[in-house]
């Protein structure tokens, strides 16, 4: 059985849940045209999504996906050879390449490395909260949720403080929603939309910067994580220069974008639920369990990174040819009433660690999940202890994206 192509409008980027309710009622997988002009088979069911994320017949190799996206869009995406190399990392590779890359990177991302960051994250959170003191109104994204992960990840890799704002701008442009053919009156002035040419230019600039950073660090090895990646080896195997560039890009971008949203979305959920806010303020030991529920309820990633059918497959009775794109909606899967008793309510405990798909599943499970959890836990502990009466100052607007799920800003009155 095949399915007709369903066109998803711009509103899907801001508020996808009504769309997912309709799709789920019709079946677990659908052929959709995303607002960015790319068609994909979209899975909205938890169990099927979990299976697809771990399926060997569904590949992630960037070199195989690139011609498929070009064919589906009917045009080249404007990426150059230099910028395309940024995407050749472990998240866009299949075994045995993926196995090799993850093994090497894991040597630098140990539990010991994460544990050693605890004091620095605490100090950073305190410093940021000190800066807010006395302000009538603050934006918790710009003032708190963003600085924590971007500072931590940049310090880990030795990215100079003077370069971090530009890095953040380039990251935002590269991960922005396609501005071509989008029906959104805000697209022209929003930093969360970008043309193919703008994304390509940002990719080239970032790639050039990373090449220079790696060259400088190779000559001046230190204790930072980049130095560890340069030195990482397994039985004589090391990351090549191109692999280092791609891996550094992946960790720097994924290492802050998702955690910003985890902290921001969790704070928004608390600000909308005063009873829960009061409960966690009085019982901070419950914050780790609350974070797992925040990850399920409003996770930091909307739709999984692209996969493709390496051969014809059948999902839930739907025949999908080879060389088609497949995506899993992590938001939809985590709101599946077949998996969660109260999918649209925050219920601490219904999404114990490993019970949601916010960090993915299978061999591509997020290698930075322990760091994200630590940053989020300390961020929540510190701000709840400091500002028990904080409240929303105005309505928030979501970032228009099928990749990330996060608010554009989070204005609050502290007390």
Regions found by a protein language model. Name each.
Residues 1-415:
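Cytochrome P450
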């Amino acid at each position: 059985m095949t399915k007709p192509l369903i066109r998803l409008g711009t509103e899907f980027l801001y508020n996808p849940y009504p769309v997912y309710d309709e799709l789920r009622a019709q079946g677990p997988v659908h052929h959709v045209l995303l607002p960015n002009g790319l068609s994909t088979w979209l899975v909205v069911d938890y169990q099927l999504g979990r299976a697809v994320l771990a399926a060997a017949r569904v590949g992630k190799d960037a070199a195989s996906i690139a011609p498929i996206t070009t064919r589906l869009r009917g045009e080249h995406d404007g990426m150059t050879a230099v910028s395309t190399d940024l995407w050749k990392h472990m998240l866009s590779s299949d075994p045995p390449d993926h196995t090799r890359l993850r093994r090497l990177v894991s040597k630098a991302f140990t539990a010991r490395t994460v544990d050693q960051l605890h004091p620095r994250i605490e100090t950073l959170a305190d410093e940021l909260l000190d800066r807010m003191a006395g302000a009538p109104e603050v934006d918790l994204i710009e003032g708190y949720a963003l600085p924590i992960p971007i500072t931590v990840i940049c310090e880990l890799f030795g990215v100079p403080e003077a370069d971090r704002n530009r890095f953040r701008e380039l990251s935002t442009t590269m991960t922005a929603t396609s501005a071509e053919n989008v029906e959104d009156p805000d697209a022209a002035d929003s930093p969360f939309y970008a043309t193919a040419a703008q994304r390509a230019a940002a990719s080239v600039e970032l790639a050039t910067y990373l090449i220079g950073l790696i060259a400088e660090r190779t000559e001046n090895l230190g204790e930072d994580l980049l130095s560890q990646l340069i030195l990482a080896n397994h039985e004589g195997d090391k990351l090549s220069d191109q692999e280092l560039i791609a891996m550094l890009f992946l960790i720097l971008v994924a290492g802050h974008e998702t955690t910003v949203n985890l902290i921001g979305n969790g704070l928004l959920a608390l600000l909308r639920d005063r009873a829960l806010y009061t409960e966690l303020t009085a019982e901070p030991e419950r914050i780790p369990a609350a974070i797992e529920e925040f990850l399920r309820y409003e996770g930091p990633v909307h739709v999984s990174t692209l996969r493709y059918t390496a051969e014809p497959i059948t999902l839930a009775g739907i025949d999908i040819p080879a060389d088609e794109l497949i995506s899993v909606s992590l938001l939809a899967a985590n709101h599946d009433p077949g998996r969660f008793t109260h999918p649209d309510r925050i219920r601490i405990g219904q999404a114990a660690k490993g019970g949601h798909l916010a960090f993915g599943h299978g061999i591509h499970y997020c290698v930075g999940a322990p760091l994200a959890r630590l940053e989020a836990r300390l961020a929540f502990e510190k701000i709840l202890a400091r500002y028990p009466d904080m409240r929303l100052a105005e309505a928030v607007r979501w970032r228009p994206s099928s990749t990330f799920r996060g608010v554009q800003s989070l204005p609050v009155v502290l007390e």
